[in-house]
Amino acid sequence: MAWFIPATRLDPTEQLPFLQQIENNPGKNFWLKGFAGSGKSVLLLHCLLIDKRKNPNSKAIIVLYTYSLIDMIKGGLPNEYANTEVLTFYQFRHKHENYDLILVDEIQDLPEHDIREICSKTTTNGRVIFAGDINQSIYDHSSSNDKINEILKIPQNATVTSLNKIWRLSRRIRKISAEYCNDRQNYEAAQVMDFNANVPVSLIKADNLEQECQWLWKSSKEYGDAGYVPAILISNKDSILKFISSVLKIENKPQLNFEWINNGEIQFNLINNHLESNGIKLQYLGNKFGSFKKAHSDNLVTIITFHSSKGLDFKTVFIPFLSHDYQIYGDLTIAKALFFVALTRSREQLILSHSGIKMHPFLTTTIISECTIKNAGDELRRIQNPLGGVNNGEDVVVI
Protein backbone atom coordinates (compact mmCIF):
# COMPACT_ATOMS: atom_id res chain seq x y z
CA MET A 1 0.00 0.00 0.00
CA ALA A 2 2.91 2.35 -0.73
CA TRP A 3 0.81 4.95 -2.59
CA PHE A 4 -2.34 4.72 -0.46
CA ILE A 5 -2.99 7.73 1.80
CA PRO A 6 -4.77 7.06 5.12
CA ALA A 7 -7.81 9.12 6.10
CA THR A 8 -5.80 11.00 8.73
CA ARG A 9 -3.69 12.54 5.95
CA LEU A 10 -6.50 13.46 3.55
CA ASP A 11 -7.31 17.08 2.83
CA PRO A 12 -10.01 18.34 5.26
CA THR A 13 -11.36 20.94 2.82
CA GLU A 14 -12.05 18.73 -0.25
CA GLN A 15 -11.27 15.06 0.16
CA LEU A 16 -12.78 14.37 3.58
CA PRO A 17 -16.01 16.29 2.77
CA PHE A 18 -16.43 14.12 -0.34
CA LEU A 19 -16.09 10.95 1.73
CA GLN A 20 -18.61 12.38 4.19
CA GLN A 21 -21.02 12.83 1.29
CA ILE A 22 -20.49 9.21 0.34
CA GLU A 23 -21.19 8.08 3.89
CA ASN A 24 -24.26 10.30 4.34
CA ASN A 25 -25.91 9.33 1.04
CA PRO A 26 -26.05 5.51 0.77
CA GLY A 27 -27.41 4.32 -2.55
CA LYS A 28 -26.58 7.62 -4.30
CA ASN A 29 -24.44 7.56 -7.44
CA PHE A 30 -21.50 9.96 -7.68
CA TRP A 31 -19.16 11.30 -10.33
CA LEU A 32 -15.89 12.49 -8.79
CA LYS A 33 -14.14 14.94 -11.10
CA GLY A 34 -10.58 16.11 -10.67
CA PHE A 35 -7.49 17.06 -12.62
CA ALA A 36 -4.44 14.80 -12.86
CA GLY A 37 -2.91 14.41 -9.42
CA SER A 38 -5.99 15.46 -7.44
CA GLY A 39 -6.32 12.15 -5.58
CA LYS A 40 -9.28 10.52 -7.35
CA SER A 41 -7.94 6.95 -7.20
CA VAL A 42 -7.10 7.23 -3.50
CA LEU A 43 -10.62 8.44 -2.75
CA LEU A 44 -12.16 5.56 -4.69
CA LEU A 45 -10.38 3.12 -2.39
CA HIS A 46 -11.62 5.06 0.63
CA CYS A 47 -15.16 4.65 -0.75
CA LEU A 48 -14.56 0.90 -0.67
CA LEU A 49 -13.40 1.09 2.95
CA ILE A 50 -16.49 3.10 3.95
CA ASP A 51 -18.76 0.59 2.24
CA LYS A 52 -17.07 -2.43 3.84
CA ARG A 53 -17.03 -0.80 7.26
CA LYS A 54 -20.79 -0.32 7.12
CA ASN A 55 -21.55 -3.67 5.52
CA PRO A 56 -18.72 -6.24 5.61
CA ASN A 57 -20.71 -8.54 3.33
CA SER A 58 -21.22 -5.89 0.66
CA LYS A 59 -20.46 -7.17 -2.83
CA ALA A 60 -18.07 -4.66 -4.39
CA ILE A 61 -16.04 -4.49 -7.58
CA ILE A 62 -13.50 -2.05 -9.03
CA VAL A 63 -13.61 -1.50 -12.80
CA LEU A 64 -10.63 0.07 -14.60
CA TYR A 65 -9.38 0.59 -18.14
CA THR A 66 -5.85 -0.84 -18.18
CA TYR A 67 -4.04 -3.80 -16.65
CA SER A 68 -1.27 -1.49 -15.46
CA LEU A 69 -3.81 0.51 -13.44
CA ILE A 70 -5.21 -2.74 -12.04
CA ASP A 71 -1.70 -3.65 -10.91
CA MET A 72 -1.36 -0.31 -9.13
CA ILE A 73 -4.82 -0.40 -7.51
CA LYS A 74 -4.31 -3.94 -6.23
CA GLY A 75 -1.11 -2.74 -4.61
CA GLY A 76 -3.12 -0.13 -2.71
CA LEU A 77 -5.83 -2.43 -1.35
CA PRO A 78 -5.69 -3.16 2.39
CA ASN A 79 -4.83 -6.79 3.09
CA GLU A 80 -8.30 -7.54 4.44
CA TYR A 81 -9.85 -6.49 1.10
CA ALA A 82 -7.18 -7.95 -1.17
CA ASN A 83 -9.73 -10.39 -2.64
CA THR A 84 -11.92 -7.55 -3.97
CA GLU A 85 -12.57 -8.06 -7.68
CA VAL A 86 -10.58 -5.64 -9.84
CA LEU A 87 -11.32 -5.98 -13.54
CA THR A 88 -10.95 -4.16 -16.83
CA PHE A 89 -14.04 -2.82 -18.58
CA TYR A 90 -13.69 -5.57 -21.16
CA GLN A 91 -13.74 -8.27 -18.47
CA PHE A 92 -16.67 -6.60 -16.73
CA ARG A 93 -18.78 -6.86 -19.89
CA HIS A 94 -18.86 -10.63 -19.40
CA LYS A 95 -20.02 -10.48 -15.78
CA HIS A 96 -23.64 -11.56 -15.33
CA GLU A 97 -24.23 -10.51 -11.74
CA ASN A 98 -25.12 -7.40 -9.78
CA TYR A 99 -23.10 -5.53 -7.18
CA ASP A 100 -23.79 -3.40 -4.12
CA LEU A 101 -20.92 -1.09 -5.02
CA ILE A 102 -19.22 -0.52 -8.36
CA LEU A 103 -16.17 1.76 -8.35
CA VAL A 104 -15.12 3.02 -11.78
CA ASP A 105 -12.02 5.03 -12.65
CA GLU A 106 -11.43 6.90 -15.94
CA ILE A 107 -15.13 7.25 -16.86
CA GLN A 108 -14.17 9.70 -19.62
CA ASP A 109 -12.67 6.85 -21.65
CA LEU A 110 -15.84 4.76 -21.69
CA PRO A 111 -18.26 4.61 -24.61
CA GLU A 112 -21.91 5.29 -23.84
CA HIS A 113 -22.99 1.63 -23.88
CA ASP A 114 -20.39 0.67 -21.26
CA ILE A 115 -21.50 3.41 -18.87
CA ARG A 116 -25.13 2.33 -19.25
CA GLU A 117 -24.23 -1.32 -18.72
CA ILE A 118 -22.26 -0.54 -15.56
CA CYS A 119 -25.19 1.43 -14.13
CA SER A 120 -27.52 -1.50 -14.86
CA LYS A 121 -25.47 -3.97 -12.81
CA THR A 122 -26.16 -2.63 -9.33
CA THR A 123 -28.39 -4.32 -6.77
CA THR A 124 -31.67 -2.66 -5.72
CA ASN A 125 -29.93 -0.46 -3.14
CA GLY A 126 -26.55 -0.53 -4.84
CA ARG A 127 -24.67 2.34 -6.42
CA VAL A 128 -21.87 3.35 -8.76
CA ILE A 129 -19.13 5.82 -7.92
CA PHE A 130 -17.31 7.08 -10.99
CA ALA A 131 -14.08 9.07 -11.14
CA GLY A 132 -12.53 10.76 -14.13
CA ASP A 133 -11.11 13.78 -15.90
CA ILE A 134 -12.47 14.82 -19.30
CA ASN A 135 -9.09 16.41 -20.08
CA GLN A 136 -7.55 12.94 -20.15
CA SER A 137 -9.92 11.46 -22.73
CA ILE A 138 -7.61 9.48 -25.04
CA TYR A 139 -9.85 7.22 -27.12
CA ASP A 140 -11.94 7.78 -30.24
CA HIS A 141 -14.99 6.17 -28.63
CA SER A 142 -14.92 8.23 -25.43
CA SER A 143 -18.11 9.83 -24.10
CA SER A 144 -18.42 13.61 -23.84
CA ASN A 145 -19.06 15.46 -20.60
CA ASP A 146 -22.65 16.21 -21.67
CA LYS A 147 -23.29 12.58 -22.63
CA ILE A 148 -22.02 11.34 -19.26
CA ASN A 149 -24.28 13.84 -17.48
CA GLU A 150 -27.21 12.61 -19.55
CA ILE A 151 -26.55 8.93 -18.84
CA LEU A 152 -26.03 9.45 -15.11
CA LYS A 153 -29.11 11.70 -14.98
CA ILE A 154 -27.32 14.47 -13.16
CA PRO A 155 -28.46 15.99 -10.84
CA GLN A 156 -31.59 13.86 -10.31
CA ASN A 157 -29.95 10.45 -9.86
CA ALA A 158 -26.28 11.28 -9.34
CA THR A 159 -24.14 13.94 -7.68
CA VAL A 160 -21.05 15.56 -9.18
CA THR A 161 -18.17 16.54 -6.90
CA SER A 162 -15.11 18.38 -8.21
CA LEU A 163 -11.64 18.40 -6.67
CA ASN A 164 -9.81 21.69 -7.20
CA LYS A 165 -6.47 20.94 -5.59
CA ILE A 166 -3.55 19.23 -7.32
CA TRP A 167 -1.31 17.22 -5.00
CA ARG A 168 1.05 15.39 -7.33
CA LEU A 169 2.31 17.99 -9.77
CA SER A 170 4.73 20.84 -9.29
CA ARG A 171 3.86 24.31 -10.56
CA ARG A 172 6.40 23.86 -13.35
CA ILE A 173 4.81 20.64 -14.57
CA ARG A 174 1.34 22.16 -14.31
CA LYS A 175 2.50 25.14 -16.38
CA ILE A 176 3.98 23.11 -19.22
CA SER A 177 1.14 20.56 -19.26
CA ALA A 178 -1.49 23.35 -19.35
CA GLU A 179 -0.55 23.83 -23.01
CA TYR A 180 -2.40 20.57 -23.73
CA CYS A 181 -5.29 20.72 -21.25
CA ASN A 182 -8.73 21.25 -22.79
CA ASP A 183 -10.00 23.02 -19.68
CA ARG A 184 -6.91 25.17 -19.45
CA GLN A 185 -8.50 28.07 -17.58
CA ASN A 186 -9.74 25.96 -14.66
CA TYR A 187 -6.60 23.81 -14.70
CA GLU A 188 -4.41 26.87 -14.30
CA ALA A 189 -6.73 28.18 -11.58
CA ALA A 190 -6.54 24.95 -9.55
CA GLN A 191 -4.46 25.15 -6.39
CA VAL A 192 -1.15 23.31 -6.72
CA MET A 193 0.16 22.14 -3.35
CA ASP A 194 3.67 22.16 -4.88
CA PHE A 195 5.67 19.93 -2.56
CA ASN A 196 8.38 19.67 -5.24
CA ALA A 197 8.64 23.35 -6.19
CA ASN A 198 12.42 23.38 -6.63
CA VAL A 199 12.75 20.29 -8.82
CA PRO A 200 13.56 21.37 -12.40
CA VAL A 201 12.04 19.98 -15.58
CA SER A 202 14.90 18.94 -17.87
CA LEU A 203 15.19 18.89 -21.64
CA ILE A 204 18.08 16.76 -22.90
CA LYS A 205 19.45 17.36 -26.39
CA ALA A 206 21.28 14.52 -28.15
CA ASP A 207 23.28 14.68 -31.37
CA ASN A 208 21.54 11.63 -32.81
CA LEU A 209 19.16 8.82 -31.90
CA GLU A 210 21.95 6.43 -30.93
CA GLN A 211 23.34 8.91 -28.42
CA GLU A 212 19.85 9.63 -27.08
CA CYS A 213 19.21 5.91 -26.49
CA GLN A 214 22.56 5.51 -24.76
CA TRP A 215 21.90 8.53 -22.52
CA LEU A 216 18.32 7.41 -21.82
CA TRP A 217 19.37 3.96 -20.68
CA LYS A 218 22.37 5.10 -18.63
CA SER A 219 20.43 7.93 -16.97
CA SER A 220 17.26 5.95 -16.22
CA LYS A 221 19.37 3.09 -14.86
CA GLU A 222 21.15 5.58 -12.59
CA TYR A 223 17.80 6.65 -11.19
CA GLY A 224 16.72 3.04 -10.82
CA ASP A 225 19.86 2.09 -8.92
CA ALA A 226 19.20 5.04 -6.59
CA GLY A 227 15.73 3.71 -5.76
CA TYR A 228 13.69 6.21 -7.74
CA VAL A 229 11.81 3.46 -9.67
CA PRO A 230 11.73 5.59 -12.87
CA ALA A 231 9.41 5.20 -15.83
CA ILE A 232 10.12 5.75 -19.52
CA LEU A 233 6.98 6.76 -21.41
CA ILE A 234 6.96 5.99 -25.14
CA SER A 235 3.98 6.50 -27.43
CA ASN A 236 3.99 3.17 -29.28
CA LYS A 237 5.19 -0.41 -28.94
CA ASP A 238 7.35 -0.36 -32.08
CA SER A 239 9.46 2.41 -30.56
CA ILE A 240 9.58 0.47 -27.29
CA LEU A 241 10.97 -2.58 -29.11
CA LYS A 242 13.61 -0.46 -30.85
CA PHE A 243 14.68 1.04 -27.54
CA ILE A 244 14.88 -2.37 -25.84
CA SER A 245 16.99 -3.59 -28.77
CA SER A 246 19.28 -0.57 -28.27
CA VAL A 247 19.63 -1.36 -24.56
CA LEU A 248 20.63 -4.95 -25.35
CA LYS A 249 23.21 -3.67 -27.83
CA ILE A 250 24.59 -1.16 -25.30
CA GLU A 251 24.91 -3.91 -22.69
CA ASN A 252 26.35 -6.38 -25.26
CA LYS A 253 23.56 -8.91 -24.64
CA PRO A 254 21.71 -11.23 -27.07
CA GLN A 255 19.13 -9.49 -29.21
CA LEU A 256 15.37 -10.10 -29.16
CA ASN A 257 13.97 -13.19 -30.81
CA PHE A 258 11.51 -12.01 -33.45
CA GLU A 259 9.55 -15.23 -33.03
CA TRP A 260 8.24 -13.49 -29.91
CA ILE A 261 6.16 -11.27 -32.19
CA ASN A 262 3.31 -13.46 -33.43
CA ASN A 263 0.71 -12.03 -35.83
CA GLY A 264 1.40 -8.55 -34.53
CA GLU A 265 1.14 -9.65 -30.89
CA ILE A 266 4.29 -8.90 -28.95
CA GLN A 267 5.12 -11.48 -26.29
CA PHE A 268 6.27 -9.02 -23.64
CA ASN A 269 6.41 -11.76 -21.02
CA LEU A 270 9.19 -13.42 -23.03
CA ILE A 271 10.90 -10.07 -23.56
CA ASN A 272 10.77 -9.29 -19.82
CA ASN A 273 12.16 -12.76 -19.07
CA HIS A 274 14.95 -12.20 -21.60
CA LEU A 275 15.86 -8.88 -19.98
CA GLU A 276 15.86 -10.38 -16.49
CA SER A 277 17.89 -13.45 -17.46
CA ASN A 278 20.53 -11.17 -18.97
CA GLY A 279 20.74 -8.95 -15.91
CA ILE A 280 19.05 -5.96 -17.56
CA LYS A 281 17.09 -4.03 -14.92
CA LEU A 282 14.33 -3.01 -17.29
CA GLN A 283 10.73 -4.20 -17.65
CA TYR A 284 7.76 -3.51 -19.89
CA LEU A 285 4.59 -2.73 -17.92
CA GLY A 286 1.18 -3.21 -19.52
CA ASN A 287 -1.13 -5.82 -21.04
CA LYS A 288 -0.80 -8.02 -17.90
CA PHE A 289 3.02 -7.94 -18.12
CA GLY A 290 5.41 -6.44 -15.59
CA SER A 291 4.58 -5.30 -12.07
CA PHE A 292 4.94 -2.32 -9.76
CA LYS A 293 5.89 -4.61 -6.91
CA LYS A 294 8.80 -6.07 -8.88
CA ALA A 295 9.89 -2.62 -10.05
CA HIS A 296 10.20 -1.48 -6.43
CA SER A 297 11.76 -4.66 -5.05
CA ASP A 298 14.36 -4.98 -7.84
CA ASN A 299 14.96 -1.27 -8.60
CA LEU A 300 13.83 -1.72 -12.19
CA VAL A 301 13.36 0.88 -14.88
CA THR A 302 9.79 0.59 -16.18
CA ILE A 303 8.94 1.22 -19.82
CA ILE A 304 5.29 1.90 -20.65
CA THR A 305 3.12 3.38 -23.40
CA PHE A 306 1.37 6.73 -23.03
CA HIS A 307 -1.99 4.92 -23.06
CA SER A 308 -1.03 2.45 -20.33
CA SER A 309 0.45 5.18 -18.14
CA LYS A 310 -2.94 6.83 -17.56
CA GLY A 311 -3.93 6.85 -13.91
CA LEU A 312 -0.39 6.01 -12.79
CA ASP A 313 2.32 8.15 -11.26
CA PHE A 314 6.06 7.79 -10.84
CA LYS A 315 8.72 9.64 -8.90
CA THR A 316 10.79 10.16 -12.05
CA VAL A 317 9.44 10.18 -15.60
CA PHE A 318 11.39 10.21 -18.88
CA ILE A 319 9.60 11.19 -22.11
CA PRO A 320 12.17 10.60 -24.88
CA PHE A 321 12.39 10.77 -28.68
CA LEU A 322 10.58 14.13 -28.99
CA SER A 323 12.12 14.94 -32.36
CA HIS A 324 10.17 16.58 -35.19
CA ASP A 325 9.11 13.32 -36.88
CA TYR A 326 8.01 11.46 -33.72
CA GLN A 327 4.37 10.40 -34.04
CA ILE A 328 2.44 10.33 -30.78
CA TYR A 329 -0.92 9.46 -32.37
CA GLY A 330 -2.54 9.88 -35.77
CA ASP A 331 -5.40 12.06 -34.55
CA LEU A 332 -4.09 15.45 -33.38
CA THR A 333 -6.71 15.96 -30.65
CA ILE A 334 -5.98 12.57 -29.08
CA ALA A 335 -2.23 13.09 -29.55
CA LYS A 336 -2.44 16.28 -27.49
CA ALA A 337 -4.48 14.51 -24.80
CA LEU A 338 -1.93 11.68 -24.68
CA PHE A 339 0.93 14.16 -24.34
CA PHE A 340 -0.97 15.85 -21.50
CA VAL A 341 -1.34 12.47 -19.79
CA ALA A 342 2.37 11.73 -20.21
CA LEU A 343 3.47 15.12 -18.87
CA THR A 344 1.33 14.70 -15.74
CA ARG A 345 2.63 11.28 -14.61
CA SER A 346 5.58 12.63 -12.60
CA ARG A 347 5.24 13.42 -8.91
CA GLU A 348 8.79 14.77 -8.72
CA GLN A 349 11.12 14.77 -11.72
CA LEU A 350 10.22 15.11 -15.39
CA ILE A 351 12.90 14.66 -18.06
CA LEU A 352 12.20 15.27 -21.76
CA SER A 353 14.61 14.52 -24.58
CA HIS A 354 15.09 14.70 -28.34
CA SER A 355 17.84 14.16 -30.90
CA GLY A 356 18.90 16.16 -33.92
CA ILE A 357 18.21 19.80 -34.68
CA LYS A 358 14.41 19.90 -34.97
CA MET A 359 12.26 19.26 -31.93
CA HIS A 360 8.70 17.94 -31.87
CA PRO A 361 6.13 20.74 -32.41
CA PHE A 362 4.60 19.88 -29.02
CA LEU A 363 7.76 21.25 -27.39
CA THR A 364 6.49 24.81 -27.47
CA THR A 365 8.36 27.96 -26.50
CA THR A 366 6.54 27.94 -23.15
CA ILE A 367 7.66 24.39 -22.39
CA ILE A 368 11.26 25.03 -23.44
CA SER A 369 11.41 28.20 -21.32
CA GLU A 370 10.48 26.18 -18.22
CA CYS A 371 13.15 23.54 -18.82
CA THR A 372 16.76 23.25 -17.78
CA ILE A 373 18.46 22.36 -21.07
CA LYS A 374 21.33 19.88 -21.02
CA ASN A 375 23.47 18.07 -23.56
CA ALA A 376 23.26 14.27 -23.71
CA GLY A 377 27.00 13.95 -24.28
CA ASP A 378 27.76 15.99 -21.16
CA GLU A 379 25.30 13.90 -19.16
CA LEU A 380 26.90 10.67 -20.35
CA ARG A 381 30.31 11.92 -19.27
CA ARG A 382 28.88 12.87 -15.86
CA ILE A 383 27.36 9.41 -15.41
CA GLN A 384 30.63 7.74 -16.39
CA ASN A 385 32.53 9.87 -13.88
CA PRO A 386 32.81 7.80 -10.67
CA LEU A 387 32.59 11.01 -8.61
CA GLY A 388 29.27 12.06 -10.17
CA GLY A 389 25.71 10.77 -9.91
CA VAL A 390 23.78 9.63 -6.88
CA ASN A 391 25.45 8.42 -3.71
CA ASN A 392 24.24 6.60 -0.62
CA GLY A 393 20.70 6.26 -1.98
CA GLU A 394 19.89 9.80 -0.82
CA ASP A 395 16.69 11.38 -2.12
CA VAL A 396 18.37 14.08 -4.20
CA VAL A 397 18.08 15.51 -7.68
CA VAL A 398 20.63 13.84 -9.92
CA ILE A 399 20.19 15.75 -13.16
Model-predicted regions and their roles:
Residues 112-126, 145-151:
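Short, conserved "post-DEAD/DEAH" coupling segment immediately C-terminal to helicase motif II
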Residues 3-9, 136-140, 150-196:
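Conserved coupling/interface region of RecA-like P-loop/ASCE motor cores
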